[in-house]
Swiss-Prot record:
Protein name per the record: 1-acyl-sn-glycerol-3-phosphate acyltransferase 2
Signal peptide as annotated in the record: none
Described function: Converts lysophosphatidic acid (LPA) into phosphatidic acid by incorporating acyl moiety at the 2 position.
Region feature Disordered, mapped onto this chain: 358-391
Any Gene Ontology CC annotation: endoplasmic reticulum membrane
Topology with respect to the bilayer: Multi-pass membrane protein
Family: Belongs to the 1-acyl-sn-glycerol-3-phosphate acyltransferase family.
GO molecular-function terms, A-Z: 1-acylglycerol-3-phosphate O-acyltransferase activity
Residue ranges annotated as motif HXXXXD motif: 92-97
Subcellular location: Endoplasmic reticulum membrane
Entry EC no(s): 2.3.1.51
Pathway in which the depicted protein is active: Phospholipid metabolism; CDP-diacylglycerol biosynthesis; CDP-diacylglycerol from sn-glycerol 3-phosphate: step 2/3
Length: 391
């Protein structure tokens, strides 16, 4: 990490990780003492506690980096957001798609009840992953034999969730890269499937499970399409922490859950059809550098995230001053060494967070030959998933 970047990132890291540990501690106490007595009371409290941490990342996007998120949606869809449970299905275009979702959830008043289906390793990320675990995010191993029951039970637990929630599901299964697109195109060409140009072939098992298990209490599916204008550099966590702006376009279309077909095969085909339509929509975006013919909705950046960050900064600064005055930490070599160690740990944690978000570090998808597939085989790749559904 370059010295100039470190000079900016480390202070932000100190604020984020120390406040995050406080939040994690509060979440743990509530989990142990309150959740056994009342799960919904725990959820209501955790929603407020978790939001005080997640708003710091919203502040980084909105105020520190000045990322501009432009939302395109019809009035009916936009007015429903935040007032109902929803399954959110999105293409995985950038390194911060999950943060874009948080921004939209925050604008809609449901940031504290935003959920997602994520890979299991994410829950071990310092502070942020722990807060997600306490908030009932669903973590999968990318092995359907193990994940099927985990996903089903996790989805069914949301039946009595006390506030409107969004559950995000990235059905492509991995972030978009040119290498993965090429693999998907080669597979589609050999399997007589529509050849994608801007998206990957969706994995439909998780989507089918989500629809089957939640259609009785989740009324809507928000189909989100993320695109980066040609005039804007792609947003990354490193760019955010360095205060470098970007522009992100998001198109949102609401589908009523009751309008989806009943059978699993038809639900899977519906999902694939939506990604074919999403691919065509992205073609139009590439040509026009916007979503043509779509209404742009106003989502001004709110003051709440700024107020939270200022409050955390004041509290931690005051606490640090009192601690240093009491401990005389810098009056000995041991104290200086401990301080240096703490800074080193925070720097390492920031690097882990940044590196975990980088799409190019993901393993490129492998092209599987078109052949019949054992129904009991794991659906861990988009190509083999399509094979099973196309039998």
């Amino acid at each position: 990490m370059a010295m100039a970047a470190a000079a900016v990132i480390v202070p932000l890291g100190i604020l984020f990780f120390i406040s995050g540990l406080v939040v994690n501690l509060l979440q743990a106490v509530c989990y142990v003492l309150i959740r056994p007595l009342s799960k919904n009371t725990y959820r209501k409290i955790n929603r407020v506690v978790a939001e005080t941490l997640w708003l710091e990342l919203v502040w980084i996007v909105d105020w520190w980096a000045g990322v501009k998120i432009q939302v395109f949606a019809d009035d009916e869809t936009f007015n429903r957001m935040g007032k109902e449970h929803a399954l959110v299905v999105c293409n995985h275009r950038s390194d911060i798609d999950w943060l874009v979702g948080w921004i939209l959830a925050q604008r809609s008043g449901c940031l504290g009840s935003a959920l997602a289906v994520m890979k299991k390793s994410s829950k071990f990320l310092p502070v942020i992953g722990w807060s997600m675990w306490f908030s009932e995010y669903l973590f999968l191993e990318r092995n359907w034999a193990k994940d099927e029951s985990t996903l089903k039970s996790g989805l069914q637990r949301l039946n009595d969730f006390p506030r409107p929630f969004w559950l995000a599901l990235f059905v492509e299964g991995t972030r978009f890269t040119e290498a993965k697109l090429k693999a998907a195109q080669e597979y589609a060409a050999t399997s007589q499937l529509p050849v994608p140009r801007n998206v990957l072939i969706p994995r439909t098992k998780g989507f089918v499970s989500a629809v089957s298990n939640m259609r009785s209490f989740v009324p809507a599916i928000y189909d989100m399409t993320v695109a980066i204008p040609k005039t804007s550099p792609p947003p990354t966590m490193l760019r955010l922490f360095k205060g470098q702006p970007s522009v992100v376009h998001v198109h949102i279309k609401c589908h009523s859950m009751k309008d989806l077909p009943e059978s699993e095969d038809e639900i899977a085909q519906w999902c694939r059809d939506q990604f074919v339509a999403k691919d065509a929509l992205l073609d139009k975006h590439i040509a026009a550098d916007t979503f043509p013919g779509q209404k742009e909705q106003n989502i001004d950046r709110p003051i709440k995230s700024l107020a939270v960050v200022v409050s955390w900064a004041c509290l931690l600064t005051l606490g640090a001053m009192k601690f240093l005055h009491w401990s005389n930490l810098f009056s000995s070599l041991k104290g200086i060494a401990l301080s240096a160690l703490g800074l080193g740990i925070i720097t390492l944690c920031m690097q882990i967070l940044i590196r975990s978000s980088q799409s190019e570090r993901s393993t490129p998808a492998k092209v599987a030959p078109a052949k019949p597939k054992d129904k009991h085989q794991s659906g861990s790749s988009s190509q083999t998933e399509v094979e099973e559904k196309q039998k």
